[in-house]
Amino acid sequence: SHAAEVTAGYYNLHDRDDYRPIARMLTRHHASLNFTCAEMRDSEQSSQAMSAPEELVQQVWSAGWREGLNIACENALPRYDPTAYNTILRNARPHGINHSSPTEHKLFGFTYLRLSNQLLEGQNYVNFKTFVDRMHANLPHDPSVDPVAPLQRSGPEIPIEVILQAAQPKLDPFPFEDHTDLPVQCLGGIGGGEVECPAGGIGGEVQQDPTGGMGGELPPAV
């Protein structure tokens, strides 16, 4: 259902993509598109709400990438569990890691919400540290990847007609893998080892856990 979007003025219908005109407008200002709900799965939402956060993320990411924007995001809810971390990792690199050339579609940045005492306790902190390593593809931080540079001046004004042309035709979003190729693992394997967490792909069934997060910027995903 797109009732909430239409009520808010977003005419994001079956034949119209109302996020891509926003992305096109942002290109004039050399801006990044920062979106939310990166940790959410469809199966965690109430069926009565007819909510599909995974498909929404796909659509918004794709709209931004098609317009040449850098995409950044954050988690909407405080989460500590590997299921949420693995959803974020899948959305950070929808096609996984490309070992032969730079990854075409990946996040430019990620804000993790939020710092709490619960995050720093026991397994929650272990999960978080592993998640940060996975966001870096298990590589050490390279400060030269995103050097600090002066902001660019905004470009010429884009006519509203040109902005609105981006809404139609509505293109299919770029495909996302069902799972991340670098998951955060759950404890519980044979002899106390690690096993992959229950996950499921887009629309898959998972068990939601009590959760939390941290306020701070992680460097761009590899």
From Swiss-Prot:
Protein name as catalogued: Beta-amylase
GO biological process entries: polysaccharide catabolic process
MF GO annotations: beta-amylase activity
Superkingdom in the source lineage: Eukaryota
Record field: catalytic activity: Hydrolysis of (1->4)-alpha-D-glucosidic linkages in polysaccharides so as to remove successive maltose units from the non-reducing ends of the chains
Pfam families according to UniProt: Glyco_hydro_14 (PF01373)
The keyword Transcription regulation is assigned to this record: no
Active site (record annotation): E74
Entry's family note: Belongs to the glycosyl hydrolase 14 family.
Binding site for substrate: T36, N75, A76, R114
InterPro entries, per database record: Glyco_hydro_14, Glyco_hydro_14B_pln, Glycoside_hydrolase_SF
EC numbers for this chain: 3.2.1.2
Protein keywords: Carbohydrate metabolism, Glycosidase, Hydrolase, Polysaccharide degradation
Keyword Transmembrane helix: no
